[in-house]
């Protein structure tokens, strides 16, 4: 097989100066967007009670638990800034992504215990379903890091009702366990 690739004709043509310049401009635009996203993720990481308050209670934040649990450098967050209901914190309180734990890939989901003690809030069921869908599609184990005070009671009608409510999350979890 190596000989085939050594003798193979080059594919395509060299990029023109205009294409190279366009590529550089696109990269610069993407870097600006990434800076904006990174700043928003950092803002969400700092929402809620000060980290020291959690430490004084003997707790770790969800971000610290993820860092402790996963193999270094493997956590790839997915929906940290997803907020379909415009929650006052600017997030659904869900931290999720792909990660490796002891060399095995998994889908990881946790609740931000710095904001309302990790309570379920509006928009969270949709985020949870996105995560369980990914685990199902990729045939990966789903790891929950739950430190949750329950449901924000004035918003419970937004949590359980309809086909994409939190009840569906429980059903999906039962499916994944089979």
Report the location of each language-model feature.
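Terminal-region recognition feature
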Residues: 1-178
């Amino acid at each position: 097989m190596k000989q085939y690739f050594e003798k193979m004709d080059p594919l395509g043509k060299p990029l023109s100066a205009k294409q190279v310049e366009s590529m550089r401009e696109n990269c610069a635009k993407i870097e600006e967007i990434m800076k904006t996203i990174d700043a928003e993720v950092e803002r969400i990481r700092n929402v809620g009670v000060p980290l020291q308050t959690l430490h004084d209670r003997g707790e770790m934040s969800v971000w610290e638990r993820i860092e402790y649990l996963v193999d270094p450098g493997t956590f790839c967050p997915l929906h940290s800034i997803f907020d379909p209901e415009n929650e006052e914190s600017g997030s659904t309180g869900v931290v999720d992504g792909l990660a490796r734990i002891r060399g095995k890939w998994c889908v990881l989901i946790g609740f931000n215990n710095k904001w309302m003690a990790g309570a379920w809030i509006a928009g969270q069921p949709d985020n949870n379903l996105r995560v369980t869908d990914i685990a199902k599609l990729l045939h990966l184990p789903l790891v929950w890091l739950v430190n949750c005070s329950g449901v924000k009671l004035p918003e419970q009608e937004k949590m359980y009702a309809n086909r994409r409510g939190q009840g569906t999350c429980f059903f999906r979890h039962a499916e994944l366990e089979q």
